[in-house]
Structures are given as C-alpha cells and as structure tokens.
Amino acid sequence: EMQRSLVGSEMCIRDRMYEMIEVVNAILPEDRPRYLMGVGTPVNILEGIERGVDMFDCVMPTRNGRNGQLFTAEGVINIRNKKWEDDFSPIDPEGTAFVDTLYTKAYLHHLVTCGEMLAAQIASLHNIAFYLRLVTMAREHIAAGDFRPWKETMVQKLTQRL
C-alpha cells in the first residue's frame, strides 16, 4: 500500500519518510529535541517516536474529527456509517476525554448526519485526547523497555476500520 504523507512541502512515500527521519536524526545533535511537522496519523506518530522524534504537530485529529472520523486504540471509526446509528455504547469506553463516556456512538452519528456543529467539537475533543493518551502510553512503554512490541501491536490495531 502506497500511503503518501506530507513532510514540509515534499510529498514522500511513507517508507521514504521514515528513512529520511533516520538520516536527519543521525545528523542532529543528540541533546536537542526532534520535531516532525505536519505528520500525524497515529501510526506515523508511533513510527516517528521509534525513530527518535520528540515532537509532532498536525491538524489530523481535528480535521478528521470534523469529518466524522474517530481514532481509538482498537481502530478507526467513521461515525457517519449507518452501522453506528443504533450503537448506544460510549464513543470510547477507554477514552480519557469527558466526551468519550458522556456521549454514545448513536448520538454522535445523529449529530454528524444532521450537520450539527457539536459533532465536530465532540469528535475533535475525543481525537485530541486520544492522541495525548497514545503518546502517554508510548512514553510508558519506552520507560518499561517494551516499546517496540507494544508499538507493533498498536500499529495493527490502529489501522483497523471499525
């Protein structure tokens, strides 16, 4: 699968981007933080962390949230899909944002399908909290010394369409 990612103003094939991160990080002083701009799928972030990147910024959590896409530790939810219409379970039972357990998938599906702006706000809050939780978990697994196996498991989950 050829996914493309935007790095600065260059379009790069995903694997080439990871290779370039390694090349650049080998040149940069080790006592300085590494910043990767405009890259932001959860998988990209984990791959970047594995390669020594310290900081990221991207619009993906909010842009995708505005379009009805929710990132979870079990995979990606397109809340616009009819399958969520009657799912009264929490948006993300493992989530850390207040919206994750306060609202249901069915309610968020309803808001999205009728164009209610509250849907974009809820989804954006959820996605930002998920990203924060993801990097917090990454930090914990780095400290525990088991980042790589945890990351491999997470990458498989994060690419699932729910």
Question: What do the PLM-derived regions correspond to, one by one?
Answer:
Residues E1-G8, C12-I13:
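Single conserved hydrophobic/aromatic residue that forms the stacking wall/gate
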Residues D15-L36, P42-L162:
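Alpha/beta catalytic cores of nucleotide-metabolism and tRNA/nucleoside-modifying enzymes
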